[in-house]
């Protein structure tokens, strides 16, 4: 993103710019940040939605799954018309409609040792929205190796962590 905030950008993010701990400098930092979300399901969907609305300048999304009917009630970026389509394709389209100022990089693949190393280098922060321990351990390993910030969340029935 740009280093300058024009009038339209300032208006868009005015509610967070007025916060003492954000301000213009903080908003520029948000606009210039690069975050990747691994998994755009129950956790990743709302995360990518909010990050795009906050103005994160570059968002990566990685998921190899297709949308099913059972996703619709708990994954807010999807609706019935999206069933059978790849999650990353729909997320990219909907996020661009929400905020056309940001860059979206999509990775329609399963995260594995052979491909993740190349992907991770382009981002400052990794957000774990995955639903399996193998991926969680891999994200932890590479976040340490490349000194990346890793944000982890998990859901189990009615518990969130």
PLM region spans:
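Adenine nucleotide-associated cytosolic modules
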Residues: 1-161
């Amino acid at each position: 993103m740009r280093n300058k905030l024009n009038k339209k950008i300032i208006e868009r993010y005015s509610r967070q710019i007025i916060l003492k701990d954000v301000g213009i400098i903080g908003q520029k930092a948000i606009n210039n940040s690069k975050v990747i979300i691994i998994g755009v399901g129950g956790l990743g969907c709302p995360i990518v939605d909010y990050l795009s609305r906050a103005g994160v300048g570059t968002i990566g999304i990685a998921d190899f799954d297709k949308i099913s009917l059972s996703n619709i009630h708990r994954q807010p970026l999807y609706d019935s018309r999206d069933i059978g389509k790849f999650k990353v394709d729909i997320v990219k389209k909907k996020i661009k409609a929400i905020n056309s100022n940001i860059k979206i990089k999509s990775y329609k693949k399963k995260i594995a040792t052979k491909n993740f190393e190349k992907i991770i280098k382009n981002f400052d922060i990794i957000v774990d929205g995955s639903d399996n321990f193998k991926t969680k351990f891999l994200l932890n390993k590479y976040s340490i190796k490349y000194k990346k910030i890793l944000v982890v969340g998990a859901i189990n029935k009615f518990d969130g962590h």
